[in-house]
């Protein structure tokens, strides 16, 4: 009882054709195809316009500056 036979599918297709008609179904399928094409084109455009990340800048940790960094102890109290 739970499965649909070929006759069930034929009846369902016949009812759909009677309700919507051949013209509306073909128009609907054309709109779906056009939407899929637009979606794929949008995905391709996004890949083309994606910017490359900037080059990684490295810092020289051994470089000395004229003034030492300002270091304060957070937990210490001034005496």
Swiss-Prot record:
Cell location: Cell inner membrane
Q: Which GO terms describe its biological process?
A: protein transport by the Tat complex
> What InterPro entries does UniProt report for this protein, alphabetically?
TatA/B/E, TatA/E
Where does the chain cross the membrane? 1-21
The record's annotation in Pfam families points to: TatA_B_E (PF02416)
Signal sequence extent = none
Instruction: Pull one GO CC term from this UniProt entry.
Output: TAT protein transport complex
Q: How does it sit in the membrane?
A: Single-pass membrane protein
Source domain of life is: Bacteria
Its keywords, alphabetically, are: Cell inner membrane, Cell membrane, Membrane, Protein transport, Translocation, Transmembrane, Transmembrane helix, Transport
Bias class Basic and acidic residues marks the residues at: 42-60
Q: Name one GO molecular function term.
A: protein transmembrane transporter activity
The segment annotated Disordered runs over 42-79
Share what the entry says about its subunit structure, partners included.
Answer: The Tat system comprises two distinct complexes: a TatABC complex, containing multiple copies of TatA, TatB and TatC subunits, and a separate TatA complex, containing only TatA subunits. Substrates initially bind to the TatABC complex, which probably triggers association of the separate TatA complex to form the active translocon.
UniProt record similarity statement: Belongs to the TatA/E family.
What does the UniProt record say this protein does?
A: Part of the twin-arginine translocation (Tat) system that transports large folded proteins containing a characteristic twin-arginine motif in their signal peptide across membranes. TatA could form the protein-conducting channel of the Tat system.
**The protein's name:** Sec-independent protein translocase protein TatA
Q: Which organism is it from?
A: Rhodopseudomonas palustris (strain HaA2)
């Amino acid at each position: 009882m739970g499965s649909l036979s070929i006759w069930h599918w034929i009846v369902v297709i016949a009812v759909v054709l009677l309700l919507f008609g051949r013209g509306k179904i073909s128009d609907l399928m054309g709109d779906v195809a056009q939407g899929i094409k637009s979606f794929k084109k949008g995905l391709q455009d996004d890949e083309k316009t994606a910017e490359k990340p900037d080059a990684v800048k490295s810092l020289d940790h051994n470089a000395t500056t004229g003034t030492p960094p300002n270091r304060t102890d957070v937990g210490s109290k001034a005496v």
